[in-house]
């Protein structure tokens, strides 16, 4: 070995010795792997559902100002959104707090002390009043002021890993806020269209009640004229009572829905006034294929992903704790035993200190912290894998439900058309003077009941479509 290579080797020897003296790191846990479902998921979907992803403000497609206003109020005033927003601000503040530890710090300090020296103590000579010896005891007023600086050198990347972990938490909280936003919007939309369904059903039931009252009035007139017996009108009276009971049930459901909407929109101070509107025909939206796109569109999966990234950075920080900590410190001060001498050049003092902390024996504390970090990371990965499977199942289940209800609506529409043809025939016979007007009412009642069934199916279809939009992430984009 020549002299040029000998001295660098000697210089590196203390560093190698320090690293060898660090507390040993034990690998006790095996990391889980993140699941990518694209290759395992059957992405075949009905052709009628392949119309593209929903927009992030998907509720605007209904062109309903009432619904838009309700959702906007919920997003602005709902306590859940306020909690989600505060969680983001807390995570951002925590990330900033960790990031500040990675830079130098400079402090200014000043102090003044009035003290009497003990003649019998270690500083006994200073208790004497001997100007020739430089002592003016026993009382002294000493002062110090100046700058102190410190810098923790993040050689092994511990602080950087902690900052990355905190930033991952911030991104996860932002995704959770978006998930809360979509859940709130979906809940408000579902309740709103359920109310509109009940309002439309209420109108149809009132029409049924009107036709039943027409039949009852006709039967009573025939009975009074001695043409029919009282028994023939009993069944109509019973049906009218059932219709009235259904109307009461519908009114009760509408009040419950209004109360729930008021709670979601934080609208308890004044009563909620809704105007009935026609139920829309919602076009189901789903991409041609699922897979990686699904992961990018679900806010809950993005939150789970960022929690995984954060946990991996936490592992890096736990590993970096096994290596030496190096700190640099410096000070520049004025220090004098008498205040009158404090600003003299001779009172100046300065210094630089380099400190090193080497973990050697810690009773397993560092390994325990590393095990905790790895366990939390594995838990985050397992939660992510579970969320992926559940997300794919949610989409498949919601898509199947939308398709099934779409087919039921088609069949119901045909049934309603057939029932209307029966009403048309009865009306024609009435116009020809063949039957009485009450018989037309009797023909209208089954058609109206089928219309009520159609409204319920249409409401179920709307509800399933909104659930499908939520399963697709509600148009969420990173």
Label each residue range with its predicted role:
Residues 223-227, 430-434, 471-475:
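A short glycine-centered flexible hinge/capping loop motif at secondary-structure junctions
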Residues 52, 60, 75-77, 97, ...:
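Amphipathic alpha-helical coiled-coil scaffold segments and their short linker/junction regions
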Residues 71, 144-148, 192, 291, ...:
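Membrane-embedded beta-strand positions in outer-membrane beta-barrel channels/transporters
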Residues 82-83, 99, 139, 153-181, ...:
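Sec/SRP-type N-terminal targeting helices
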Residues 53-62, 109-148, 271-287, 316, ...:
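Small/polar, glycine/serine/threonine/aspartate-rich low-complexity segments that form flexible
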Residues 23, 175-290, 401, 405, ...:
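Periplasmic alpha-helical coiled-coil/stalk elements that build and connect Gram-negative outer-membrane
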Residues 67-69, 90, 142-144, 190, ...:
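Transmembrane beta-barrel architecture of outer-membrane proteins
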Residues 2-76, 124-128, 167, 251-293, ...:
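Terminal intrinsically disordered/low-complexity segments used for targeting and assembly
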